[in-house]
Amino acid sequence: MQPSGWAAAREAAGRDMLAADLRCSLFASALQSYKRDSVLRPFPASYARGDCKDFEALLADASKLPNLKELLQSSGDNHKRAWDLVSWILSSKVLTIHSAGKAEFEKIQKLTGAPHTPVPAPDFLFEIEYFDPANAKFYETKGERDLIYAFHGSRLENFHSIIHNGLHCHLNKTSLFGEGTYLTSDLSLALIYSPHGHGWQHSLLGPILSCVAVCEVIDHPDVKCQTKKKDSKEIDRRRARIKHSEGGDIPPKYFVVTNNQLLRVKYLLVYSQKPPKRASSQLSWFSSHWFTVMISLYLLLLLIVSVINSSAFQHFWNRAKR
């Protein structure tokens, strides 16, 4: 009899394989990072030996994971350790992730404000749904306040922790305008902070990905930005600058959130690095064998010259001209 966790993982992967694949990819990226001790959080307890994390054993098992299509078609007994690991990756009491359609990206663009410059549409889009009590707590904090939607760019290796633990202001490394989580209404700016990184080699999304978070932010005074005072055209200076800011006022299009309870990730935009366009098979073969081809042509030319200069050819040619 298979463990109940396997059945739940099978059901989740079968229902939305791309979403399950994404979680495996984010896990793999964190595991491969040189900062794995800090970015791979949560960490599977079955690979913890007291206070030590057995990364070598985890890396060995993760490297043997087949792609999800193959795993779903196999019997659990043949991939016991794989199913144990995938079950852990897909389990969460706080949230679930769904793949979303292209229409959702148009909605996101409207929520964040129409882009001033052309922005690339994501190859894949995912929506995060939160369970209670986390969801109820967020809306309790929100109260009657509006929601702001903005983008957050980060390295791929950070997203395993981001989706499970949220964005934490004190962990932010960009502090020119003060301590906090930096977001922007401009997707092209967020993409600068989201370089492509190595994910999961067997991913259906692709082995090299870039990820941008779309966050819901409660419109609270602790969210610093360029905003006007209520019923006025004047900028609200209390919200335009953070105490001890080295760079002065928050620039337009940026938001700096100084309270962890005021934001959460709602969508993930995923960009897959396209393989370089291959030349035609003929050109590809020629580029690999150009030296042999040139020598062959040279020898053929010598043969032609030799034949032309031969007495037999000259005799035949002279007779043909008569």
Swiss-Prot record:
It is found in: Endoplasmic reticulum membrane. Its EC number is 2.4.2.-. In absence of activation signal, PARP16 is autoinhibited by the PARP alpha-helical domain (also named HD region), which prevents effective NAD(+)-binding. Activity is highly stimulated by signals, which unfold the PARP alpha-helical domain, relieving autoinhibition. It comes from the Eukaryota. Gene3D superfamilies: 3.90.228.10. This is Protein mono-ADP-ribosyltransferase PARP16. It comes from Homo sapiens (Human). The modification N6-(ADP-ribosyl)lysine is found at residues 110, 137. The lineage of its organism: Eukaryota, Metazoa, Chordata, Craniata, Vertebrata.
